[in-house]
Every structure is written in C-alpha cells, then in structure tokens.
C-alpha cells in the first residue's frame, strides 16, 4: 500500500495547530490566554462573539467565529460554555471549517479579600471539552479532555495582576497530559481603555512534542456599559515554528 506522506504531514500539522489554537479561543480570560479567579456577578451575563487562531509552520487554524457565554449562577460561582465554528487551513491543503469542540466549565472563587487586604483573590475553574469537532479534518481533539486550574488576582489602583495554571487530561493516540502556567499585568489607561501583557508556558501536549513559551499583548475598550471590544495578538518565544508563529483574538462582548 502506498503511503501518502503529504496527507500524513497535513494531519500532523492540523493536530499541532488545533492544540496550539485551542488556547487562543478558550481556557482564558478574554482577550488573553491566562485566566483570572473573578466570576461574573450573581444574575449577570457575559456574551462574546469572537474569532481566534494560531499560525504554525505549514498551517493556521482556530475559531472562525464562536460564542462564549458566562452566567453568574450563585455568589462566587460562574457557569461557562463556548460553542465554536472551527477552521483549519494547511499549506498545500484545502481550507476546512465546521463545528469545533464544545467547552463547558464552572468558575468558583473561594477567597474574596476586601479592598484593604494584602492577600489575593483565589479561585478554581475546572473545564471539560466535548469532542464535537471532526478531528480528522483538524477541527477537534477527537476525545473528551479535561482541565483543572487555580487562579489568583490582586488589584491596586489602576493596575491588575493575575495568573496561575493547571493540568490538562489529554487522551488520544500520540497525545499526553500537560501543564500550563501563565501571568498577566494590566493597566486601566483611561476610563474606557485597559491594556495588558501576558507570558505563559505549556509543556508538550504530544509525545515527542515541544514545550512552548509565548506572550500576548492586548486590551479592552468599553464603548459603553454594555458593549466592549477585546483584542490581543502575540507569538511564541520557544519553538515558535511548531507552537506559535502568530496568534490573535478579537471579540465583541455584551455584558448585563
């Protein structure tokens, strides 16, 4: 039987770009990859319409368009869902798009300091990814995945700093479980504009794969009390050709 090496390379690139690009779209405190422990307030909503992606050598993919919904279901408890339309565009291969993996989670803050307290907010944010995307086309992982995280945040004046990390359960042929850690610093530059920068590190998610360290810069612009623009962009600092030559996130957020 003749082996089509081009197809094998395309499938490997698709797997790499899916796992790299998945962080651009989810597991994060938009518009960044690093998350925070602060849940949506009780009875309030956050709804995002977003696009995100990551380019690696020979491929680019991510979320063509997606919807993220967060709801404050109880004091200090946020329920979370992301439903994406994923895409993958390998060099020398066809552009494909379709349903991506669905993300479900719940954020719970268990340490809530007062304004004058020295210690940070602390919360957990367990997530699962339901394999709704077609893994053979580079649109999903093909297996149920789970992510357990701990996040911390401290505010002072116009500055906010948050970070933490967690552990991914990542089953499937050629895959392995992996760690993520990240930290962010953000400043409220004007009443309407906040700018920030983050750095994050992830161990290899595939057997024989490469660790990655990347950064993003971005911001949030408030049009008014209910509508907001979120944006970020960045690239890898470690093994960028295989992990992150360029990544982006752009969203319109509605809050109520």
Locate each region found by the language model.
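Bacterial N-terminal signal peptides
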Residues: 11-22
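Transmembrane beta-barrel domains of Gram-negative outer membranes and organellar outer membranes
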Residues: 27-256
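Bacterial N-terminal signal peptides that target proteins for export
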Residues: 2-13
């Amino acid at each position: 039987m003749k082996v089509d090496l081009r197809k094998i390379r395309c499938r490997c690139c698709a797997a790499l770009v899916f796992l790299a690009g998945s962080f651009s779209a989810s597991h994060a405190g938009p518009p960044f990859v690093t998350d925070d422990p602060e849940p949506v307030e009780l009875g309030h909503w956050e709804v995002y319409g977003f696009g995100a992606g990551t380019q690696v050598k020979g491929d680019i993919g991510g979320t063509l368009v997606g919807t993220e919904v967060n709801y404050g279901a109880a004091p200090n408890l946020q329920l979370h869902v992301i439903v994406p339309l994923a895409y993958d565009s390998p060099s020398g291969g066809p552009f494909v798009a379709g349903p991506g993996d669905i993300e479900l989670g719940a954020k719970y803050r268990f340490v809530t300091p007062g304004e004058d307290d020295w210690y940070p907010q602390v919360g957990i944010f367990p997530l699962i990814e339901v394999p709704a995307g077609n893994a053979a086309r580079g649109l999903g992982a093909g297996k149920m995945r789970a992510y357990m995280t701990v996040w911390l945040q401290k505010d002072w004046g116009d500055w906010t700093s948050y970070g933490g990390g967690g552990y991914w359960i990542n089953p499937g042929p050629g895959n392995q479980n992996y760690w993520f850690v990240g930290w962010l610093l953000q400043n409220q530059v004007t009443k309407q504009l906040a700018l920030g920068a983050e750095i994050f590190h992830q161990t290899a998610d595939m057997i024989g794969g490469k660790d990655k360290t990347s950064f993003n810069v971005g911001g949030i612009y408030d049009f008014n009390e209910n509508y907001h623009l979120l944006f970020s962009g960045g690239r890898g600092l470690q093994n960028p050709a295989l992990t992150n030559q360029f990544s982006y996130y752009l969203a319109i957020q509605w809050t109520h």
